[in-house]
Amino acid sequence: MKQGAVICGLAIVGVLAASPASADMSKAFGNTIVSHYPNGQWVRHYFDPDGRYTSQFSDGRRVAARWSAEGDKICLSGFSPRQILPRFCSRMVEADVGDTWRARDPLGRNIRNELVAGRR
């Protein structure tokens, strides 16, 4: 299995893992996960080693939360501002910078996630 970072399929995100029991988020730290919507909108997701998560939406909105690895999932909770769902978990996906994968956002909409080098 190639070394990956944890990228959650939420928009609010998507994540990569060396193994489900031990999420290796290192490739997500310092990089950006971009969720692309079919209508051209996007969400940029940022994970920090200390459990902080932030996102920026194409319409200017920003969201903050805490992330945690739980088995084969990455979960977000403690959203600020509050969201429709108080907690959202997404399966882990193995990926490297430049990789893309399909997922669904918390409302069930199709998205294409991409792990992009650097913070954008």
PLM regions: where:
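Lipid interaction determinants
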Residues: G9, A18-R120
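Bacterial N-terminal signal peptides that target proteins for export
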Residues: M1-C8
